[in-house]
Amino acid sequence: MSTKEKLISHVMKEEPVGSRNKVTVVGVGMVGMASAVSILLKDLCDELAMVDVMEDKLKGEVMDLQHGSLFLKTKIVGDKDYSVTANSKVVVVTAGARQQEGESRLNLVQRNVNIFKFIIPNIVKYSPNCILMVVSNPVDILTYVAWKLSGFPRHRVIGSGTNLDSARFRHLIGEKLHLHPSSCHAWIVGEHGDSSVPVWSGVNVAGVSLQGLNPQMGTEGDGENWKAIHKEVVDGAYEVIKLKGYTSWAIGMSVADLVESIIKNMHKVHPVSTLVQGMHGVKDEVFLSVPCVLGNSGLTDVIHMTLKAEEEKQVQKSAETLWGVQKELIL
């Protein structure tokens, strides 16, 4: 008799029970790992699967996380073969070429489309009912690409979009007012990145509209220069990349925030990238961020935001820019 047999007496053969809240992270770069750790520390899933083409890096990261199993409640698995991802509830795609210092998010496009042509069919093969969350940049275009390549209905393909931009925005407003970001309600919509749209008309604290107190807020004529806050949001990522070489922690936490709303069926409203054709005067098949309700089925509803004419025009301009790029893509 082995030590194990002397220690444990077997009662029954265990039936395999599938995890109802398995999460997969594709890509073990800086963003993938920050997302994985954030998901683990929030205790969101029973099983976390990780995939990447870089076999040694993947193996090392998985092993490193597994060494912390005692401190976690999640089973961690990893392999370059996508069978390890089978039956995931949410699949987070962070893989792709990384943005270089000074490189625009749009410049990354075709490089990442080619990577997606391999990744997406593999995800669909093993988790045909999952919710796909795209994080790789340029996120709005790649969410469209993932939607096209997956054949999934639109409510199951979500881009992380401006969830992080809005968090940065709320943080900076909070800094200016000496308040916690959760008490500063503010939304950034449209494209994730350089042409994102701050909805100044909706900025409020405890239901008090800041534009009601300062009608010039967000415009050139504003003596308090609130507009600079949005510029800081846009420049924020570039600044972090310049200083430490990449961004990771905040986007990782932002991803975990979205995954939580889905897995726990919270019906929370998040600014995420979805098909906006027919909204805010957008005519083309583009994905942009608008406030959306997230739950167990994915993206169930969209909130009708009251945008000013100028804001609406910016959203349409973003849509045109994105469509200009999308129609050139070889899918």
Curated annotation (Swiss-Prot):
Subcellular location per UniProt equals:
Cytoplasm
EC annotation from Swiss-Prot or TrEMBL: 1.1.1.27
Oligomeric state and partners? Homotetramer.
Q: Where does substrate bind?
A: R105, N137, R168, T247
The name of this protein is L-lactate dehydrogenase A chain
The entry's function note states: Interconverts simultaneously and stereospecifically pyruvate and lactate with concomitant interconversion of NADH and NAD(+).
Entry keywords, A to Z: Cytoplasm, NAD, Oxidoreductase
Q: What gene does this protein come from?
A: ldha
Q: InterPro entries of this UniProt entry?
A: L-lactate/malate_DH (IPR001557), L-lactate_DH (IPR011304), L-lactate_DH_AS (IPR018177), Lactate/malate_DH_C (IPR022383), Lactate/malate_DH_N (IPR001236), Lactate_DH/Glyco_Ohase_4_C (IPR015955), NAD(P)-bd_dom_sf (IPR036291)
